[in-house]
Amino acid sequence: MEDFVRQCFNPMIVELAERAMKEYGEDLKIETNKFAAICTHLEVCFMYSDFHFINEQGESIIVELDDPNALLKHRFEIIEGRDRTMAWTVVNSICNTTGAEKPKFLPDLYDYKENRFIEIGVTRREVHIYYLEKANKIKSEKTHIHIFSFTGEEMATKADYTLDEESRARIKTRLFTIRQEMASRGLWDSFRQSERGEETIEERFEITGTMRRLADQSLPPNFSCLENFRAYVDGFEPNGYIEGKLSQMSKEVNAKIEPFLKTTPRPIRLPDGPPCSQRSKFLLMDALKLSIEDPSHEGEGIPLYDAIKCMRTFFGWKEPYVVKPHEKGINPNYLLSWKQVLAELQDIENEEKIPRTKNMKKTSQLKWALGENMAPEKVDFDDCRNISDLKQYDSDEPELRSLSSWIQNEFNKACELTNSIWIELDEIGEDVAPIEHIASMRRNYFTAEVSHCRATEYIMKGVYINTALLNASCAAMDDFQLIPMISKCRTKEGRRKTNLYGFIIKGRSHLRNDTDVVNFVSMEFSLTDPRLEPHKWEKYCVLEIGDMLLRSAIGQVSRPMFLYVRTNGTSKIKMKWGMEMRPCLLQSLQQIESMIEAESSVKEKDMTKEFFENKSETWPIGESPKGVEEGSIGKVCRTLLAKSVFNSLYASPQLEGFSAESRKLLLVVQALRDNLEPGTFDLGGLYEAIEECLINDPWVLLNASWFNSFLTHALR
């Protein structure tokens, strides 16, 4: 039956049913008929609600899924399928906003047109018997009852069927189909009887004669009689069964299930080698901004105009020179490229009208930096089919790198607060459904905690840079276009601010496929001296380009200003994902919501307000060598956001592989902590799969280090 349910119903419905059974302490492996009944009831509730909307005139209308009008208000609020706490929160909110009488039991739906709660019943018995049982239980004339059966019958309060005939016919057809599918698999009789709690034939009668002989003949191979088979099933040990099955599959497979104990797991081995280097597409904690407040200049909002205005705010330019060369690059070319940018920006300022975009002259230094004419010539395969020694290039294995402290510092910095506001509260219309009040409250609290966060700045910076680069790649394919790296924010006082981080020069960009690469040179301002952590800046040539006066406790101090220059590349698909970094905010909000839900279900009321306003309470943030780190709810929000943002900034195959494989080990460890006595086979193979993803990526190496801290403290 369980297999049938998983095949027959939408995975979302199955998941909700699993959650409901778990909430009431029922085992779906044992109560399989109940599992099927819950899924059926959920599906009927969803079908009841589907396609029914209320238009601006307050009339009920039916709208198909692909109709643009689907943004209308839903006619029905679905209460069934939510966890108890959230369901009661929705019911209370509906009662408060509509004046409806609060029901004693949780109903399934609320009808905004008829202004009444609805109890949906799905029965395998006579509809009128089930209707009377429901009515006696509810004892309220205010809640409307609507019963469906698997035979196509229905019954509703005062014969008011709420929906049109076609909508009800869809539900009846679906129930009839489920019944037929169950019957074809021999599941229907057991399912039908289970609603009445009838005893099965085996319990009532001793099986004798022909039926007994048929039972003995219907057993799997190697069983001589029904008693033997029953004894086998009663003493069934799944672990041994899996071993046996695996050994039948292949002579090579010899899996012995080993118990997983506290002493079983070992730490993940991190690679040795030179320290890992920075590989993000733009500088993070080391970035420096040239900013203008309350921009009101001519052409404000046009990137090139904004960039020139920001450049004019700095007066400490000096003759640039290389302070940290790139080991494999032609460093004078990077120096000449920066001088060319300065010269061409000066030329623009001397013109009467500043152009909207700037294409750089194709000088030898830029051609070199952008890899112009460096790609090997492509030859049609048919022209070289007959070459006997045709072979692919031998590619070198990537060099193993060790974890370096800078990536933990980057992450810590991403969790910190800045002096600026990087996102506004969404201008979302008035809440329509009661559940939206809670959602809005949570969103507003969360936004207040993360709007000043440096990780949020990285989101807005990443979105801007990737959007500008993709636009330029499509609009000026052959040009070396100069793209300012800009972001917008507000000061704490609410004044608008435009920031310039540096410039990008893009190369030729005839991007036919999603993975075709466009080369670019990035030039970014910074106050970080690269000589302090030279291994971090392996891929960069760093110039000293000026001196900046900074206010400090002892007055004004002069600090050298650096320019971090490197050749880089990206593709259409990477730029697309870079443009879509905003969902990182949503992902971390959902993680916080699940924490609130857990707390609310324990306290049996919505805990959103207490969660965010109780500043004295601390929450677990993560593992470190010292143990479980804790912090305020704001710190938790910002840490979750930073993790999501870094997953986007440092996305790579190594990260995908590590996340997927380490999750398996994590689940086994969690099962051990929950006293579920997990067993494993080929644990060495799992460690191998995890460790082959640890090559040179700083973010993956840091996650592996965190995982080891978790293992240490989880298994004490």
From Swiss-Prot:
Q: Which residues are recorded as binding Mn(2+) 1? A: H41, D108, E119, I120
Question: From which domain of life does this come?
Answer: Viruses
Sequence motif Nuclear localization signal 2 (NLS2), residues? 184-247
Query: Where is it found, in Gene Ontology cellular component terms?
Result: host cell cytoplasm; host cell nucleus
Whether Plastid counts among this entry's keywords is no
Short sequence motif Nuclear localization signal 1 (NLS1): positions: 124-139
Q: Which cofactor does it need?
A: Mn(2+)
Q: Which GO terms describe its molecular function?
A: endonuclease activity; metal ion binding; RNA binding
Listed binding positions for Mn(2+) 2 are E80, D108
Cofactor stoichiometry and binding remark: Binds 2 manganese ions per subunit.
Compartments where found:
Host cytoplasm; Host nucleus
Quote the PTM field: Phosphorylated on serines and threonines by host kinases, including human casein kinase II.
- Principal cellular location given in the protein's record: host cell
Q: Where is the signal peptide?
A: none
The EC number(s) this enzyme carries: 3.1.-.-
Keyword list, A-Z: Cap snatching, Endonuclease, Eukaryotic host gene expression shutoff by virus, Eukaryotic host transcription shutoff by virus, Host cytoplasm, Host gene expression shutoff by virus, Host nucleus, Host-virus interaction, Hydrolase, Inhibition of host RNA polymerase II by virus, Manganese, Metal-binding, Nuclease, Phosphoprotein
- The main enzyme category here is hydrolase
| One Pfam family named in its UniProt record | Flu_PA
Task: Return one Gene Ontology term, BP aspect.
Answer: viral RNA genome replication
Query: How would you summarize the oligomeric state and partners of this protein?
Result: Influenza RNA polymerase is composed of three subunits: PB1, PB2 and PA. Interacts (via C-terminus) with PB1 (via N-terminus).
Give the similarity note.
Belongs to the influenza viruses PA family.
Described purpose of this protein according to its UniProt entry: Plays an essential role in viral RNA transcription and replication by forming the heterotrimeric polymerase complex together with PB1 and PB2 subunits. The complex transcribes viral mRNAs by using a unique mechanism called cap-snatching. It consists in the hijacking and cleavage of host capped pre-mRNAs. These short capped RNAs are then used as primers for viral mRNAs. The PB2 subunit is responsible for the binding of the 5' cap of cellular pre-mRNAs which are subsequently cleaved after 10-13 nucleotides by the PA subunit that carries the endonuclease activity.
Identify this protein by name: Polymerase acidic protein
Which species is this record about?
Influenza A virus (strain A/Singapore/1/1957 H2N2)
Originating gene: PA
